[in-house]
Regions:
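Redox- and metal-dependent alpha/beta enzyme cores, enriched for Fe-S-associated oxidoreductases
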Residues: 153-155, 169-201
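Structural motif
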Residues: 3-6, 58-63, 244
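N-terminal accessory targeting/assembly segments
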Residues: 1-18
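Small-molecule kinase domains that catalyze NTP-dependent phosphoryl transfer to phosphate-bearing small molecules
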Residues: 123-127, 209-250
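Internal active-site segments that recognize and position negatively charged phosphoryl groups
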Residues: 117-163
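A glycine- and Lys/Arg-enriched "phosphate-lid" helix/loop adjacent to the NTP-binding pocket
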Residues: 186-223
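Ser/Thr/Gly-rich flexible loops in soluble cytosolic domains mediating phosphotransfer, phosphorylation
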Residues: 1, 74-115, 218-224, 230
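Metallocofactor- and cofactor-centric catalytic cores in central/energy metabolism, strongly enriched
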Residues: 31-50, 54, 59-60
């Protein structure tokens, strides 16, 4: 049972990280979002009592609701774990100030929120080589041949407040010089040719495309990747191999490169 006093997004991510360490356990997930009253906790506990071997994970900051769940769990011998219960008191000591204990604090409509909205709008407008004339205004420019996860990686970064432009590299087509001279941090994505061929074949099958034979031709793919690598080297663009990387891992590597490059310019 994933219990939160807000949307539950934070708890979902924590649970996925935890679940990955125990791949053989297939628990059914029950979401209880916006949990802020004892009436709601009663519904939660009743659901737990009807479930075999229930476990509660929660991110709650309001003490009355939290204490009610803890007491009920003790009564009915239900394991429950508060993700923030240990961290908040420790950070209060470190910062020498009391926590606000305000639910949904991370979702306030503040400057940071609107900055992320602006970043996402920019990223969507500059997807797949669109608006090259303003791509130079990006924080990050991602380049790579077709099907190297440029779009999902860009969107992931956009959600985190980075303005991203992603540009497909096409054989025998040069990019404007302004792209390389811009202040944006440039990152190249590459991939194993065999893996790329498989990805493209899957894409063609989904689209029922029988015509684009060169799109999956191994010689063409190897040439595409080779030319892209040469360009990355000549322009001194750091490269990430996405063959065995998830979008999240690729994005984390890009953020690291971004931070390093920004430090160099300070």
């Amino acid at each position: 049972f994933l219990v939160s006093d807000s949307t539950g997004e934070t708890l979902d991510r924590i649970y996925l990280a935890l679940k990955a360490q125990f791949p053989n356990n297939n628990y059914k997930i029950h979401h209880f979002a916006f949990m802020r009253t004892t009436t709601q906790t009663a519904t939660l506990i009743n659901a737990c009592k009807k479930t075999e071997n229930p476990i509660i994970l929660y991110t709650l900051v309001e003490k009355q609701t939290t204490n009610h769940i803890i007491n009920e769990c003790k009564t009915y011998n239900i394991p429950c774990f508060g993700i923030l219960d240990y961290l908040i008191p420790q950070f209060e000591k470190i910062f020498n100030q009391k926590a606000t204990l305000k639910p949904s604090g991370q979702h306030e409509l503040n400057k940071e929120y609107y900055r992320k909205i602006e970043a996402m709008q920019f990223t969507l407008q500059h997807d797949d080589g669109q608006k090259l004339d303003t791509a130079v205004d990006a924080d990050i420019i991602i380049m790579g041949v077709s099907r190297t996860s440029k779009t999902p990686t860009s969107i992931y970064l956009g959600e985190r407040g980075y303005k991203v432009s992603n540009i497909p590299l096409v054989l025998h087509q040069k990019l404007p010089d302004e792209i390389f001279s811009s202040e944006a941090v440039k990152v190249g994505l590459t991939i194993d040719p065999t893996r790329l061929s498989d990805v493209r074949k899957t894409r063609m099958n989904i689209l029922n495309d029988k015509q684009s034979s060169t799109y999956v031709d191994m010689d063409v793919i190897q040439n595409e990747i080779s030319e892209a690598k040469k360009m990355f080297v000549s322009k001194k663009i750091p490269v990430i191999d996405v063959t065995r990387k998830s979008v999240e891992e690729t994005a984390a590597s890009i953020i690291k490169i971004y931070e390093i490059e920004k430090e160099k310019k300070q």
